[in-house]
Amino acid sequence: MTLEAIRYSRGSLQILDQLLLPQQSRYEAVGSVRQAWEAIRAMKVRGAPAIALVGCLSLAVELQAGAGGPGLAALVAFVQDALSFLVTARPTAVNMARAARDLADLAAQEAEREGATEEAVRERVICWAEDMLDKDLRDNRSIGDLGAHHLLKRAAPQGGKVTVLTHCNTGALATAGYGTALGVIRSLHNLGRLEHAFCTETRPYNQGARLTAFELVYEQIPATLIADSMAAAAMAHQGVSAVVVGADRVVANGDTANKVGTYQLAIAAKHHGIPFYVAAPSSSCDLRLETGREIVIEERPDQELTDVNGVRIAAPGIGVWNPAFDVTPHDLITGGIITELGVFAPEELQAALSATIS
C-alpha cells in the first residue's frame, strides 16, 4: 500500500492531516478554496508540490459543484480571484504561484476562444488541475532515478553503497507520490545501493521526526533519526556520503529556499567535502528572480517554537524569531540541482530550464 497525502476523484478532495502523524492517520475533506487555504496555512498539508496540488484541486472541486459564473467573464474572474487567494496561504513556495499564474492564463485564453462556453471553460480548468497529479508523480520518479544515478557516480564511483542525510520531509507526503529528495533515497534503496539514511528531526515543526521517519519506517528503508544539532557530527563520524534536500524555490543563479536549517547543513557538508544536492521539480524553479535575496521568507507563529503538542517548553516572556525557510547560496550546492529534466550545476540551471519555464 502506498502512502497518499492527497486523495482525489472528480468532485471530491481529501487530504491526510499531517499534523496528526504519526499518532493518527486521518483524512479530511476539502470542499472549497477557503478550506484548502486554511489547511495549507495550518500545515495540515505541506511541501511545495502538494500545496499547489491541493490548491488547484480545491478549485476544481468548487467548479465541479457549480461555483463561478453565470457567464464567461464571471467564471474567469472567480478562477483568477480564487487562485490569487490561494497563493497568499504560504508565499515562499513558488509552485502554487506558478500554477496559479498558468491556470488563470488558461482560463482567460479558453474564454476568449470563438464559440467558448461556460461549460467548456469550466471543464478545461478542472482537467488541467487533475493532470497536475499525474505529472507530479512522473516528475518525482524521474527526479529519484536521475538523482540516484548521479549521486552514485559522484559519491561511489567504485561501486558499493552510500549513506545519505536528508532534512525536513520531501517524500510522498509532500507531493503526489514518491517524493523529491526522499525519492532519491527511495530510488537508491530500490537499486540496492543505499546503506543507510539519516533524517533530521527538523525543528520546530518536526517534519523529519513526524513525517520523514514515518515514511522511512513505512517503506522499510534503513534509517536513523537525529536532532538537527547532530548533523555535522553525523557527517564527521557516521560515513555520510551525500546530503540531499528538497526546495520550495530555486532562483536563476541557483540560490535555494528550503526548510530552515538547510543552510547550515550545506555549510557543514562543504566543510566535510560531502556533495550537497537539491532535488526539486522544475516547477519549483523561479527564473524571474535573480538571487535568493529576492525571496520572501515566511515567518511562522511564536507558538510553533515555544510549544510542543500544546505544552509550553520555553520560558514565558522570551522573544522568538521563527522563519520557516532559509536560503542556501548556490556555491554551497556542490552536488547539483536534481530536476526531472536532468541534474545541473547551479550555474547551468538558467540556461538548461529557460526554454521550459519562466
UniProtKB/Swiss-Prot annotation:
MF terms in GO: S-methyl-5-thioribose-1-phosphate isomerase activity
Task: Site Transition state stabilizer: give positions.
Answer: 168
Where it mainly occurs, coarsely classed, is: cytoplasm
Q: Which domain of life is it from?
A: Eukaryota
* PANTHER family according to UniProt: METHYLTHIORIBOSE-1-PHOSPHATE ISOMERASE (PTHR43475:SF1)
Q: Which family does it belong to?
A: Belongs to the eIF-2B alpha/beta/delta subunits family. MtnA subfamily.
**Protein name, as recorded:** Methylthioribose-1-phosphate isomerase
Biological source species: Bos taurus (Bovine)
Provide the organism lineage as a comma list: Eukaryota, Metazoa, Chordata, Craniata, Vertebrata
Provide the gene name from the record.
MRI1
